Regions:
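Signature aromatic-anchored transmembrane alpha helix within multi-pass, membrane-resident enzymes
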Residues: 112-115, 183-213
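Hydrophobic alpha-helical transmembrane segments in integral membrane proteins
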Residues: 208-224
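Transmembrane catalytic cores of multi-pass membrane glycosyltransferases
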Residues: 1-166
Length: 224
C-alpha cells in the first residue's frame, strides 16, 4: 500500500477540512488547519527526499528509470499536466461507475451510484442550509471538487501509469460518505423536512458498502 500513502494523507486532510466547514468552524481555523496539512506534506516530502539521497549515496545504487521509477517524475512535461488532471478525474469516476467485479458487476455499479447520489444530495443539503455561511459552503464545494484529485494524485505523479494498489485511497470515499451523512443527520437534515429521506442514508450507504466489500471477497477468491 506504500504506493498510495501520499494519496491517503491528502484525502484525509481534505475530508477533515470538509468536516470542519460543515461543523461551522471559523474560516480562520479552517485555513490554519489547511496550512498545517500542507506543511505536513511538504515537511514529509523533504524528509523523504533527503533520506532518499542519503540512501543512494551510501549504497551507491541508482534510482530506477523504468516503469514507475522516481526519476520518471521529473520527466513529466508540465504541458501535459492538464491532461493528467483530466485523466485522474476520468480514472476516479470510471472506478466507481464501471468497477471491476468478479460476479456482481451490475449490482456493484448500482451500489456505487447510490453512494455517489447520496453524496451529491448531501452537498445540495449543505448548499441550501441557511445557518451555514456562504464562504463555508464555497469551501465545501471546492474541497469536494479536488477530493478526487487528492485520492488519485498518483495518476498525475506517475504520468497515468496507475494500478489497483495505487488507488487504495479511493476507499476513503465510502468512509467520507458515511461521515458526511452522519454530520448532516445531526445538524442540517433535522431542520430540513424536504431532505428527511436522507436521514436514513446511513443504513442505505452501509448496505451499498457491504455489497462492495462482498465483491472484494469474491474478486480475490476468483483470481486465486
Amino acid at each position: 500500500i506504500y504506493q498510495s500513502y501520499v494519496s491517503v494523507v491528502i484525502s484525509l486532510i481534505i475530508i477533515l477540512l470538509i468536516n470542519d466547514c460543515i461543523s461551522k468552524i471559523s474560516v480562520k481555523s479552517i485555513f490554519k488547519n489547511g496550512m498545517q496539512g500542507i506543511g505536513m506534506l511538504i515537511g514529509g516530502g523533504m524528509v523523504y527526499l533527503v533520506s532518499l539521497k542519503v540512501v543512494v549515496a551510501v549504497t551507491g545504487q541508482k534510482l530506477a528509470s523504468s516503469y514507475n521509477g522516481l526519476t520518471n517524475m521529473s520527466q513529466i512535461a508540465s504541458s501535459k499536466l492538464f491532461t493528467f488532471i483530466q485523466n485522474a478525474y476520468g480514472d476516479w469516476i470510471a472506478s466507481f461507475i464501471s468497477p471491476e467485479a468478479a460476479y456482481i458487476g451490475g449490482l456493484l455499479k448500482v451500489a456505487n451510484i447510490a453512494v455517489l447520489c447520496f453524496v451529491i444530495g448531501g452537498l445540495i443539503a449543505i448548499f441550501i442550509d441557511k445557518n451555514l455561511n456562504m464562504l463555508n459552503k464555497i469551501m465545501v464545494f471546492v474541497l469536494a471538487a479536488v477530493l478526487p484529485i487528492g485520492m488519485n494524485i498518483s495518476c498525475i505523479l506517475s504520468g497515468g501509469m496507475v494500478h489497483v494498489l495505487m488507488r487504495y485511497s479511493f476507499w476513503l470515499f465510502y468512509a467520507w460518505a458515511l461521515l458526511l451523512i452522519q454530520r448532516l443527520k445531526h445538524s442540517i437534515l433535522k431542520e430540513k423536512k424536504r431532505f428527511k429521506y436522507m436521514a436514513s442514508g446511513g443504513a442505505v450507504l452501509s448496505i451499498a458498502i457491504l455489497i462492495v466489500i462482498w465483491n472484494n471477497f469474491q474478486a480475490p477468491n476468483a483470481v486465486y
